[in-house]
Amino acid sequence: VPGVTVGHEMVGVVEAVGADVKTVKPGDRVTVNVETFCGECFFCKKGFVNNCTDPHGGWALGCRIDGGQAEYVRVPYADQGLNKIPDSVTDEQALFVGDILATGFWATRISEITEEDTVLIIGAGPTGICTLLCVMLKQPKRIIICEKDAVRAEFVSKHYPDVLLCEPEECEAFVKEHSDHGGADVVLEVAGGRDTFQLAWKCARPNAIVT
């Protein structure tokens, strides 16, 4: 919407609450969910809050109402969209919870990863690293990351030495060489590039899960 201040990844301090808000109070440090949602419609109850049918639901912050780059933000359905930050967690540590880490968590959850799987993650940017952290919780047999940026690849190599690395040009052959069934059992495409979606399918084994 023209004139709306953008921004949807944020943490903040509650300044005031509406009469129906029960879970947070002024002074609380909170994370802010990337999407607003009612929690009561068909899609919310199924966990697909991005498809909330409420007029105030969906992509509101930074799209229809002022977002995180504004000094003050109004968050509809604050009981669903705000989460208190523990005193032991800094604002910087909590920042990714509302969107990027949640993206990796949800992608991992719906990918049905098992301990026997070879998992390919395409992209090692912030979303890719958050996805990696969530995938590691599933303890798959093998994790491969495809990343063309040398700095990002070096970061992965330094901090996650057990993760295999390859570049896009060699990715298909590398994955097939390092998998047990002709390709990755699970592919998570988090790069969003022009060719990465097609690459994901090329690297997946028959009947694989591509997210």
Regions found by a protein language model. Name each.
Residues 23, 128, 196-197:
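Short, well-ordered alpha-helical microsegments
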